[in-house]
């Protein structure tokens, strides 16, 4: 418009430029003679952050590096939903539809069993696959999942990604055993430009304590292995096809600025890797980076502090240029999906994206003296580490050495947390002395699902063991009861009743629990909850004899009710192998809580 005033260059002539020498002199005065070097921050990678940075920092880099290109699409808020083994995922599909209606920008299904069981037909009926961003993590048969997706959506490309994470082989070594399946995935995904099917799972390394340098280097090595071994002339798969189908998964930790720099350094090195294989380096801008909050930094104690950790981690991901963010529930270490914690996790990125608008600026870290320097140093260190690993044969040949290096770093972190050198709020500093656990410590420590790879796990074990000691003393004053309900048919009736209550309106037959027909159905009634269990007749007979102190060989009628102190019965059901009755992966108390709206 004609009345619009001309733009005026920003200038502050009233302020004189301050040189590096002047800053150093002022710093010395503020420290009253102390060595300014004492303010340096040494990271686990060995990189050193200076007390301050000046414009000369960019001069040392040869000038300000060009900013990263804008994202091809807005950053997505992705909700992860785990489909338990033995289920078809209908419950998770319902949860996915609800999450998308409440602000989620995408869904990530983690399939814990055969992909043939997953209700893709139901998914296609509930969600338009061509326009809904959906990621899939599978433990086996990735090509079969893609074949089913291709059959359901034959003429429309998909949005999202496929991540193959087989549990039968180590991370980074799946190529040797599954090369044929991965090539088949590439063939099936042709034409799906926004659905990469080759995962570089950097989160695997990060969630085991790898330094930022190691995470970038080992991820590059995994990608280089695929670029070298997946192309196939007979199948018509070129190195460009492989490169175009990568997506990179990173776990973002709480080290705020270094995490921003790590993501920026990764894109720069990705361009270098593409160039090394004769591909346009501009393709690095199209690399999908899926960032998730780190399990390595998550804590079981004082779990609400995880909300704050996840917020800084998500901020680092957005500002560093991630294309999608997946925030875990603050309490996911000790319990399954709950609507309350799921809503908080879903809303954290929404606030960052919809209220703070952190993704409205392309590469907001560009030009920062500190972040540009840190990005450059991280990139250089990671490239050196990558080249060293490649010289040993890459991830296929030298994976054990890489994992040993990660273990060494993780052990050092364990020690620093145990001695208080590294602060973990709520775990080794500023603990909540009146904390009431939302879980049973003994049950959690014995659970196969409890993550023992986290940084705070050793410290948590000590705290929980102490809690167990006092809990057992308290339980000796509490009474509990085992009630014999009947045979396995009772459990089947209970399972059917719970299933129909959880899935109102469903007319199909509910899945029956996998329980032997001669098993007993048992109710374990405790002061604060009731748990359905099952056991063989021999197990129940042995427990009854021990608890009621019946001599071996003495004939007695199996009682229908056994009373004792809680501590004794808790130990007895464990020793004699009583199994907890689960409904779609949920404990009795969880099912009852859901039915009661808790």
Placement of each model-derived feature along the sequence:
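Intrinsic disorder at enzyme termini
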Residues: 5-16, 34-41, 47-66, 323, ...
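Active-site capping/gating regions of soluble enzymes
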Residues: 2, 226, 247-440, 579-582, ...
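Short, hydrophobic/aliphatic alpha-helical segments
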Residues: 31-34, 304-313, 476-480
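Short, surface-exposed linear patches
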Residues: 63-65, 101-105, 182-186, 220-223, ...
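Catalytic alpha/beta active-site cores
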Residues: 2-255, 259, 318, 324-328, ...
